[in-house]
Amino acid sequence: MVKEEEKDKVHFNHDDIQQKLDKKLGPEYISKRIGFGSSRVAYIEGWRAINLANQIFGYNGWSTEVKNIIVDFLDERQGKFSIGCTAIVRVSLADGTYREDIGYGAVENERRKPAAFERAKKSAVTDALKRCLRGFGNALGNCLYDKEFLSRIDKVKFDPPDFDEGNLFRPSDEISEYSRSNTIDNDNPAVKRQKLNNQNSIPDTNKVKYNGSAPAPAITYNNAPKKPVQSEERYAPNGSRGKENAQNKSENEDLLDDSFMFSDDLQDDELISLMNKNSSDPDRRFNNAPKENTGDITFVTARAADSYQSTENVPENLKFDPKYVPHSMKLTIDQNTSKHIPLSVLKEKGVTATSREAIYSRFAAKGKQIPNPIDDSTDSRLAENDKSNENDDTETSHSTEIEKSAISSVNNGTNISGSTESSVTTVPSHNSTSQTTNIEAKVDKADSQVSEKQSQKGIKYAPQVPVVHPNTSAAIPLNQNKPLRREVGRPKINNVGPKKPSPTP
């Protein structure tokens, strides 16, 4: 009788199991997918079937066994694999009852061969497992083959189950308190140190010895801090007490060996306990002077600092001085104002100039021409040359007019008329060529004098930069005649010119 009762405790009652298996599945357990011909197929997922089997039979009330797996076909086409597998699985209960069935799994167009085998075999075993569990009753999926039941279960409404955070399996549930206390000695030295500190912080009252003749002290409960009870160990001989202290100290040093530990290995609780220990030490003396209340810290710009400090009560040590200049910075003028640099400062820096205009003339404004930097001596020399050459300009202008008229008369084969007859005599025909060459030389000389005057005035133009070919890195002439050959890809352009006369018939 005792053995039968133990069996009933270990295994579920057969009547309860049969009652659960006779019930049909609710809509929460049924899933649907699209089958062949756009028809919807009802099925139960593999993980739901395993959960139902654990709830009905118990976690140790049933077992599975894969009898055989057969690869039906393996095709490879264009680097993709298609596999079909057949699996035979047996599900056995604790009393020896079992169900055995077949399952099939197929994978198509899988690029990786191992992944194709994995998916095909797993799907075959899962299919066989669900078919085996279906043989035990409606609650494990047999009701899904009843079409009348499926037509009615679609009309049943249900609310999805809420997510329960309290029903989660956490790491704290993994080990019991008893087993955790037994394995604490095998932890790292930081845990040992924490355990030792907790033991030292609690006064040991087991070693207290009272005199038998004296009455036992009455136990009182109050909120006052407890004082350590004086034991008779302090009245022990000095020799024995010193030996015990040395032995305890050596044991503590073995446990608190910090030779192989770093600051990162210390736990947060341990650091807090060490800080509390240091603060509670009566031998340490700290300065308990009240700290100055500096108030809230506010970030403002340098311009707004002066106005902010005038309205708010800012301590003197925290005020911002906008006129503060570090000793490492050497300034020539005051930075608070905008003014010209004194000439005395420029002379100290080695700049020799009589006026600021002479200095600023070297730096032209945007969009203007930059004149040549010319000294004062050259300016005076150019001024004298301009005065001396004023008369020359008038003479050269008059002579150039006469020379141009003479050139035109020579080219046309006529004499000079008008006012030029009084100043220029008629030139014989055989000396016309020499006369023209002399006139052209004078004109070139006049043009060169004009260009020299323009250059002396300091006008500077940027020279023409030669164009460099990107492939040959050679300069391309600026005035290069374009070839008449048409480039590839461009339309043909006819040259503008006189049309050829059409041939007459």
Swiss-Prot record:
Single Gene Ontology MF annotation: DNA strand exchange activity
Role according to the record: Involved in DNA double-strand break (DSB) repair and recombination. Promotes the annealing of complementary single-stranded DNA and by stimulation of the RAD51 recombinase.
Chief localization: nucleus
Annotated PANTHER family: DNA REPAIR AND RECOMBINATION PROTEIN RAD52, RAD59, DNA REPAIR PROTEIN RAD52 HOMOLOG
Biased composition (Basic and acidic residues): 229-251, 378-404
Alphabetical keyword list: DNA damage, DNA recombination, DNA repair, DNA-binding, Nucleus
DNA-binding residues: 130-134
Quaternary organization: Part of a complex that includes RAD51, RAD52 and RAD59.
This protein's name: DNA repair and recombination protein RAD52
Family annotation (Pfam families): Rad52_Rad22
Family: Belongs to the RAD52 family.
InterPro entries listed in its UniProt record: DNA_recomb/repair_Rad52, Rad52_fam, Rad52_Rad59_Rad22, Rad52_Rad59_Rad22_sf
Record has DNA repair as a keyword: yes
Biased composition (Polar residues): 406-439, 448-457, 470-482
One GO process term, biological-process aspect: postreplication repair
Organism whose genome encodes this protein: Candida glabrata (strain ATCC 2001 / BCRC 20586 / JCM 3761 / NBRC 0622 / NRRL Y-65 / CBS 138)
GO CC aspect terms: mitochondrion; nuclear chromosome
Compartment annotation: Nucleus
Region annotation (Disordered) ranges: 178-251, 368-505
Superkingdom of origin: Eukaryota
